[in-house]
Amino acid sequence: KLESYRRKGYPIYGCNVEGARWEQDREYGSAIFERAGIATIPMQKFKKYDDAIALVLANKNKRYVSKPVGDGDKALSYCSKDWRDMVFMLNKWKKSNAYDGEFVLQEFHKGCEMAVGGWFGLGGFSKHILENWEFKKLMSGDHGPATGEQGTVMRYTQKSLLAEKVLLPLEGFLHGIGYSGYIDVNCIIDDKGNPWPLEFTTRPGWPLFQIQQALHLGCPVGWMLDSLNGKDTLKVKDGIACGIVVSQPDYPYNNVKKKENTGYPIFDLTMEDATSNIHLSEVKMGFGPGKDGRNTEPCIVTAGSYVMTVSGVGKTVHDAKCDAYDTYKKKVCMINSPMVRDDIGEKLEEMLPLLQKNGYCKDVKYK
């Protein structure tokens, strides 16, 4: 529907239909990388589980990662240990009819996962490039179900080796489709320093966009409109941001009625808090206990299982992580079993030296 407004000349800063296809049709997105001269990991698209099982059985020496195509449930993404658990999961999804859309199997590549993105307009990419590291599992230590993104560490930089290899070569293609807005490429970087793109995100990711606000300066409307008109006026803070997702049961599933996780007060949270380093999601205005014990005191309450993201900023990854968790402990008082990973950022202590030996993010420090 937005495309008709674009054609009428309305200033719309965001993904168009062709850009969305890059993300949602993984096989098509992989072909775009290849056309830009960027090597990709082999993948195959399936509609039938039996066909996917046959591929795995014919290649028992390989590990595979399964991913839904389009808007499929992220919980159906699975990284196998060997052929046996991949076949088991495919049979399980087939039996339960968990997903009736298309999905892909992609060969597993070992390495460090890192993403790079940028804001794109008529004048090309902003000079401020965003490097980021996602934490995708529900529980600390990367255990539990995949949620898409449970927390993220990021920083803006004007010199990114990863961007030079997998993002900037796409500039001509983006101009060709009339793209505007944010675009992100998630990669596996192997021990030789080769980046292997996994997927496009042709929109501000969630909660990535919320965490970005901790680094942005000024009114976003101004620099977004300027980007549409070919000017780069985005201003950002130096330093690193860390964001942590705060959820409640039955996240990441949707097996309970909305009313069962709605209406729980978030005590003492002010609107001032919610416009700085606390980024609200599924909440609304409601009531908590007043002095007389009745629920008559206006306050912010939950309105779903994905409640908020808390961000922090610092000169190092550790500083940003501590800032985010300190804010969570001081400002967030929830009562319905809040779920928060307590290790967002920590894996970078081991990952950064591996990346830096191959020339990536050399000026990023863990401590």
Please place each PLM-identified region on the residue numbering.
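Conserved N-proximal alpha/beta basic substrate-recognition cap immediately N-terminal to
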Residues: 1-65, 71-72
